[in-house]
A protein has these predicted regions:
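Hydrophobic faces of well-ordered beta-strands that scaffold small-molecule active sites
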Residues: 55-59, 93-95, 126-130, 181-185, ...
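Active-site beta-loop-alpha junctions enriched in small/polar residues
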Residues: 59-62, 98-100, 131-135, 185-190, ...
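Aromatic-rich peripheral "rim/lid" segments of glycoside hydrolase catalytic domains that contact
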Residues: 305-336, 340, 344, 352-398
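Bacterial Sec-dependent N-terminal signal peptides
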Residues: 3, 16-46
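N-terminal substrate-binding region of glycoside hydrolase catalytic domains
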Residues: 46-114, 118-125, 131-162, 168, ...
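Active-site cleft segment of glycoside hydrolase catalytic domains centered on the general acid/base Glu
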Residues: 108-111, 138-252, 257, 272-280, ...
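Aromatic-rich carbohydrate-binding modules that target alpha-glucans
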Residues: 403-451, 461-484
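Glycoside hydrolase catalytic-domain groove-lining segments
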Residues: 81-82, 222, 226-232, 243-318, ...
């Protein structure tokens, strides 16, 4: 996460080395590691475990929040963030790992072990995110761990440190039956990585970056070869699709080792492309390089309100969305991202810090959360009603409301309101609908849960006095229309005519 800014089911295979796509296999010298055999033990076989489409949550904050007394509830019943995410369909937990942080006891290897066990106890997969730093890394900061500072200018020795650290971490986790299914080699590595000072992030030294990436990738490969495991590898950037494509091309030209997935951070606050454009890039990336696209971090606001004095990072709505946030639109964005990635052969989608609510937790920037308006919980730590967590579910229906506004006059435009537009306080909001060509028909699509019902009506302008008068024979709830999402279909159209 950029913390400095105030920061059909596609199966995953192991790395695809397509014809015409070179995969460097010896770009880093391999130190001798005596506790790993050079070949598989006699009688063992390489596992070829395939992962399902990933629907994940980065829950790196959970242990700290619980230590601060945070308790999550659903309909008044206390549940952990792990239990809640899993119950709605999340199948993976992403966890950040810092090398040796001195300012916090969290995101250390000891802390991560606790989190991995929690995930595995629920049958969830794990992605371990190596930051290769003692603190946050992102496009604006990427400082080498203090323990490696003396060799920061010797790329060969620094690469050996990366290799040995990555390998020894995996060995330790294997010995405790806590092995991750996926490993991320660096976090939001747009610029130079593992530098002495953040003033050295640019110009980007791709050759140095590739050597360091290869050290981590080679460590995972050697671990897999020696143990028969098949941990998948991820490289991660926070870029738009065009820049990300160029980034991969640069690495390929310099002999990057094979890796399974390209992770993207995708936030409306910093990336303005659409889920549709994300889907196009997902397809292009695999067709060109044989690399799966993983949205390693994403999230969307459900309110612009704050619940503490810690500056919130996000306030923008996704491109093309109404300007008024609500839990339903948070869900809509995440569902669109999921479907765009899955329908184009991508690896999956991970929501970042959906549990990071306001508390007494301490960050480098203050006390509290920079993310409570992006979390899946309200300001009382109650799970949002029809909010972002429902994107994990496969029981969503794309409901399209169509209204013919010809009876409303030539200057009228289409707007909609209803229970699904309710803001953080339960107040309905007015959303603009999109005109279909030059016709009098206006349309709005949202992703409701199967069987979900509620009241709604149309307006001819963006003010409450412009509402339609729904005839008594069309009233389904109060004096309004009634929608009911299908219980069996994935798509549904509700067509109406404006009523005077």
């Amino acid at each position: 996460m950029k913390q400095i800014k105030l920061i059909a089911n596609a199966l995953l295979g192991i790395a695809f080395c397509l014809a015409g796509t070179s995969c460097q296999t010896d770009a880093v010298s391999t130190p001798t590691v005596t506790s790993l055999n050079e070949a598989l033990p006699v009688g063992s076989t390489r596992t070829t475990e395939s992962l399902p489409f990933i629907k994940g949550a980065d829950l790196s904050y959970t242990n700290e929040l619980e230590d601060c007394g945070v308790q999550f509830t659903e309909n008044g019943v206390a549940k952990t963030s792990y239990e809640l995410m899993n119950s709605y369909g999340a199948n993976l937990v992403r966890l950040r790992l810092w090398h040796n942080p001195t300012w916090t006891k969290y995101s250390t290897l000891s802390d991560v072990k606790k989190s991995i066990k929690r995930a595995k106890d629920l049958g969830m997969y794990v992605l371990l995110d190596f930051h290769y730093s003692d603190t946050w890394t992102d496009p604006e900061q990427n400082v080498v761990p203090a323990a490696w500072a003396s060799v920061v200018n010797n790329t060969t020795v620094l690469s050996d440190s990366v290799y040995n650290y990555t390998l020894s971490t995996l060995q330790t986790l294997l010995s405790e039956n806590l092995l991750p299914n996926m490993v991320q080699i660096g976090n939001e590595t747009n610029k130079n990585i593992m530098v002495a000072d953040n003033s050295l992030l640019e110009p980007v030294d791709y050759e140095r970056n590739v050597q360091l990436f290869n050290a981590g990738l080679k460590a995972v490969e050697d671990f897999n070869n020696a143990t028969g495991k098949s941990i998948k590898t991820v490289l991660h950037v926070a870029m738009n699709p065009g820049d990300a494509n160029n980034w991969v091309a640069n690495l390929k030209a310099l002999g990057i080792h094979c890796f399974d997935m390209l992770g993207l951070s995708y936030y409306p606050q910093w990336q303005s492309y659409t889920p549709s454009e994300l889907g196009e890039f997902t397809s292009k990336l695999y067709q060109t390089y044989g690399i799966k696209l993983l949205v390693a971090e994403t999230g969307h606001i459900w309110t612009r309100e704050w619940n503490d004095n810690c500056h919130n990072l996000m306030s923008k709505m996704a491109t093309g969305y109404p300007e008024k946030p609500c839990p339903q639109l948070q869900k809509d964005f995440l569902v669109e991202v999921k479907e765009a990635v899955r329908n184009n052969g991508g690896a999956g989608v991970i929501a970042w810090a959906p549990e990071w609510v306001s508390s007494t937790n301490v960050t480098l920037w203050g006390v509290g959360s920079n993310w409570e308006n992006v979390a899946f919980f309200d300001f009382n730590n109650q799970l949002l009603n029809h909010g972002g967590i429902e994107f994990y579910s496969e029981n969503n229906v794309a409901v399209t409301f169509n209204v013919d506004m010809s009876n409303a006059g030539s200057s009228a435009k289409g707007y909609i309101t209803g229970e699904f537009t309710a803001d953080a306080n339960g107040n309905w909001q007015i959303f603009p609908m999109k005109q279909v060509g030059s016709s009098s028909t206006y349309t709005f699509t949202t992703h409701l849960s199967q069987g979900q019902t509620g009241a709604y009506y149309y307006l001819s302008d963006s003010v409450w006095t412009a509402r339609e008068t729904v005839p008594e024979n069309l009233q389904g709830k109060w004096n309004d229309r009634l929608y009911q999402a299908s219980s069996t279909e994935k798509e549904q159209i509700i067509s109406n005519t404006w009523s005077n």
